[in-house]
Amino acid sequence: IEEALQSGGTVIGISSGGKLEKLISENEESLFLSVPGGQMPRSAFGHLFGRQLSVCWALGIIEKPDDKEILKMIERLRSSSTDFDISGGNGLVVSVAKSMLNRQIGIIAPTILIPAARRFANQLNENSNVFARPSELPEMNHNEIVAWSSANENEHSIIYFSCENIHSRVHSRMNWMLENIDNDSSWIIDC
């Protein structure tokens, strides 16, 4: 960051303060955005992501939805948060978690969702002391599919990330895997 600032670059920084705030605040061409302090990054995700999204909207990197669409997004988040609440939700999160106990976890996602799959795998690896790895469809190769289909189904769980915008061929591959890979702990998460 110091090098970027010294070379005349503009920096947008997001943090809860500290050295980053001091560096950026001293530069008139840069912008510092504060988030609440005292949280580990994984628990501050909403604050960090919200700031990043706002910057991308403001700079035109991502088209900002209209107010009606933003309200629909908030409602979907609220609904998901209620449904997936561990103590008062619909029980799905608890069922998924129990089915994954003492198993390696494979997260299979189309290209458009691989960043989310990678982030989810990292969270599981760090916070749950389990081995999780993401695999990308359609890039997953024949050898990996053979390994999935020949593995002992009690040793691993498979989580498929899906969404309505995936390519029809990728959707076909995912359906093939669901039909042909025996596993009593397979879940589809519709993103």
Q: Where are each of the predicted segments found?
A:
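Short, well-ordered beta-strand core segments
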Residues: 11, 32, 105-106, 158
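Glycine-rich phosphate-binding loops that contact phosphosugars or nucleotide phosphates
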Residues: 1-82, 98, 163-171, 175-185
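Active-site phosphate/pyrophosphate-binding segments
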Residues: 39, 57-155
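Intrinsic structural disorder
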Residues: 112, 127, 176-181, 188-191
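Fold-independent oxyanion-binding glycine-rich loops
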Residues: 14-17, 110, 137, 163, ...
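Conserved beta-strand scaffold positions in the cores of enzyme catalytic domains, especially
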Residues: 32-34, 132-134, 158-160, 186-190
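Active-site pocket-lining segment
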Residues: 154-164
